Amino acid sequence: MKAEIMAIGTEILLGDIVNTNAQFLAKELANLGIGVYHQSVVGDNSERILEAFDNAFKNCDTIITTGGLGPTKDDLSKELAAKYFNMEMCLREELLCDLEDYFKKNNLEMTENNKKQCYFPKEAIILPNPNGTAPGAILEGENNKRIILLPGPPREMEPMFTNHVVPYLSKFTDSVLVSKILRVFGIGESKMEDLVCDLLDNENPTVAPYAKNIDVILRITAKGKDKEEAEKLIAPMEKEIRKRLGDNIYGEGEVTLEEVVGKLLVDKKMTVSTAESCTGGMVASTLINYPGISEVFMEGAVTYSNEAKMKRLGVKKETLEDFGAVSEECAREMAKGIAKNAGTRIGISTTGIAGPGGGTEEKPVGLVYAGLCIDGITKVKKFNFKADRQKVRTRTMMNVLDWLRRELEKID
């Protein structure tokens, strides 16, 4: 089976709505072992939608559409799918009863145009939609071709696909694709590719690196007759990759760096406080995203001025005069000072020049010092980021969290 994912809606073409449906469907179809070779977007125009059906069926046997099932005149998906397969539309009385019940239960007024959502070909396989007013449908044409019609809103589309389309499609495939994602930080995509370059030509499982935001992901994908067989193919490849990348791998799947660090802090009962200058509270804010962090996060201070650094953190005036606020010495005193004043086992500091102004030949834009004080032992790292202001701040925050992760993993 080969499929094309087709989003229908002018609002997507214009960029008013981000098409997250395509990402969801692509992943789910891959898990079923169904190849997706094309994705397309077409506006609310009859001629262009029919043309899109024609073009899609030149390369696939299954089209999965999202959108265009609403009650308005420009919702055309099912009418045009029916026309394409020479099927006649008719009122499905059972759908009308369900729709009337939906409006009554939600104390809403049902207008005449809502009945449009109850018209389908009599041959259509109806896909119930308990989360909205627009049912989906599967239309099966000649030569093993089919169009699967799904609503546009993700909260309606995703459960409909999972509960009804997956069982339907499973009948047409005898294999599954299983992927495992390893999340990497501390080495760039090119460096990581060098470390695993000989593995990238492997066919089953396949190995593919992707840069995503600031971290990098490595996807291992295997095809098997079932999930268990595919996972057995992945296991030795994962073991080899972990051997090569070591602690640069911080997690699996959709886990974030902040979740990994937050869990380590809570599990190890390591209290923490932050003193930030150039990051302006980003480290504290990111840590606070983790549920339960209140058990260990005590305090976050944004000490932007020299006066605040001296008054709040105890940074010495001589340190600022001799070395400046952006210096190893200042970062060290900031980390020690916040840990002492907040009474925490860990103190984190950041100080740097985020730009666009303020840089010198000796201290250019992108120069950052970060301090990490753990149980009285303080270390400082120096970073040089060549990026705009926001990226300098974000990269500082991510590198500090990754540094903290590595240090926490050493603690029993």
Curated annotation (Swiss-Prot):
Superkingdom of origin: Bacteria
InterPro entries: CinA, CinA-like_C, CinA_C, CinA_KH, Competence-induced_CinA, MoaB/Mog-like_dom_sf, MoaB/Mog_dom
Pfam families, per database record: CinA, CinA_KH, MoCF_biosynth
Matching SMART domains: MoCF_biosynth
Protein family membership: Belongs to the CinA family.
Protein name as catalogued: Putative competence-damage inducible protein
Organism in which the protein naturally occurs: Clostridium perfringens (strain 13 / Type A)
Gene expressing this chain: cinA
